Amino acid sequence: MNQDELKQAVAKAALDYIKPHLQSDTILGIGTGSTANYFIDALAEVRTQFEGAVASSEASAERLKKHNIPVYELNSVSGLEFYIDGADETNPRLELIKGGGAALTREKIVAANAKTFICIADESKWVDVLGDFPLPIEVIPMARSYVARELVKLGGDPVYREGCVTDNGNIILDVFNLRILEPVKLEQQINQITGVVTNGLFAMRPADVLLLGSQEGVKTIKVDA
């Protein structure tokens, strides 16, 4: 299978995973990116079996609406049963790097509201140590230079993502050359820098379930509590 076929396979596996739990009042959290798009397309098959979805980006909201899946504002719902999203990297503890699509802040907010965070990814995203993929950081525009200097002090090499404006009106710095041995600690450190909205480490709230597409099929991975 090529990468797109692996993404389709994990999207189908995620649908199979949640299908027995869907009820008429279930509201799902939906992520952003190519793998999440495959899941949205698969979700259309069962759109009459749940109430609707909260999207982590304008792009995902539009795709859901095209499938006639009702889209709700997060502030209008009390909680989410599942959050389904892809990742740019995952380690064996299901700590993630996300944000290649610049939706990291909204993804993190939606994930925080979900009882179960299901990460769907192909095997190319599996790493022992996070950091080969540059870590995205959403930054208030006027703080860009200051935040970049602080990130250099942490050992990173920040690069301004040209032409990228987030759904929140902010900019993205991609931080290269980080070997992230302590993801929770680094997530906290970066978030404490004045001007940072949030960073793409999902370590304080990691995934609960990883559906990993491989040539041998889709593997279901959970971290023992």
Swiss-Prot record:
What residues make up the catalytic site? E107
- Record-linked InterPro entries: NagB/RpiA_transferase-like (IPR037171), Ribose5P_isomerase_typA_subgr (IPR020672), Ribose5P_isomerase_type_A (IPR004788)
What cellular component GO annotations does this protein have?
Answer: cytosol
Q: What is its EC number?
A: 5.3.1.6
Q: Which GO terms describe its molecular function?
A: ribose-5-phosphate isomerase activity
For binding substrate, which residues are annotated in this chain's numbering? T32, G33, S34, T35, D85, G86, A87, D88, K98, G99, G100, G101, K125
Q: Please give the superkingdom of this protein's source.
A: Bacteria
Task: Please give the coiled-coil regions recorded for this protein.
Answer: none
Q: Write out the pathway annotation from the protein's UniProt entry.
A: Carbohydrate degradation; pentose phosphate pathway; D-ribose 5-phosphate from D-ribulose 5-phosphate (non-oxidative stage): step 1/1
The alphabetized UniProt keywords are:
Isomerase
Q: Does the keyword Isomerase apply?
A: yes
Q: Which reaction does it catalyse?
A: aldehydo-D-ribose 5-phosphate = D-ribulose 5-phosphate
A Gene Ontology biological process annotation?
Answer: pentose-phosphate shunt, non-oxidative branch
Q: How does it assemble?
A: Homodimer.
Give the similarity note. Answer: Belongs to the ribose 5-phosphate isomerase family.
Q: What is the purpose of this protein? A: Catalyzes the reversible conversion of ribose-5-phosphate to ribulose 5-phosphate.
HAMAP family recorded for this chain?
A: Rib_5P_isom_A
Q: What is this protein called?
A: Ribose-5-phosphate isomerase A
The organism encoding this protein is Hahella chejuensis (strain KCTC 2396)
Origin organism lineage: Bacteria, Pseudomonadati, Pseudomonadota, Gammaproteobacteria, Oceanospirillales
- Which gene name belongs to this protein? rpiA
